[in-house]
């Protein structure tokens, strides 16, 4: 089959979209990193949060390595634990309004998932433990939305737990 029949040449609009994405990547990454640090600090201080696992926080065991290898820009993907276990984590996820309930990473939009009730729901507590997933774990992928909106959504969802 000749190459010309496989669609190897993208349209001008698709080329423009790719170029826009590449040109704005640094700005989006900076915003994600900035938002992630603020969200992690907010969660760390919240009374309904049991723990936060984010290498961007100074008390994380790998913080120095993250600073060294990532140039101080720790990505926006991290986990935290909602007090109350599996049911609390599921209720929290269901209450989110701005965060999209999606198992993905690295988007401009903020995403959340509660593995014990989604990707790992078929596992019993012992199997979850073997897989390294706690029942209260929520995974966040932070996006570029305004930080006040992100924190407001997390706050209202935690209030429903």
Set out the residue ranges of the language-model regions.
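Active-site C-terminal subdomain of aminotransferase-like
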Residues: 1-77, 81-110
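PLP-dependent enzyme catalytic core of the Aspartate aminotransferase-like
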Residues: 28, 94, 110-161
């Amino acid at each position: 089959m000749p190459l010309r029949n496989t669609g190897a040449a993208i349209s001008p609009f698709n080329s423009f979209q790719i170029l826009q994405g590449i040109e704005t990547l640094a700005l989006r990454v900076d915003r994600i990193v900035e938002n992630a640090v603020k969200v992690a600090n907010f969660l760390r201080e919240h009374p309904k949060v049991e723990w936060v696992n984010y290498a961007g926080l100074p008390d994380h065991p790998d913080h120095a390595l993250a600073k060294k290898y990532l140039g101080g820009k720790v990505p926006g993907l991290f986990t935290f634990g909602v007090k109350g276990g599996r049911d609390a984590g599921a209720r929290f996820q269901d209450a989110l309004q701005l965060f999209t309930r999606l198992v993905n990473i690295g988007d401009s939009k903020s995403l959340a998932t509660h593995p014990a009730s989604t990707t790992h729901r078929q596992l019993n507590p012992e199997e979850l433990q073997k897989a390294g997933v706690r029942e209260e774990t929520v995974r966040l992928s932070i996006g570029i939305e305004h930080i006040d909106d992100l924190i407001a959504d997390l706050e209202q969802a935690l209030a429903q737990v």
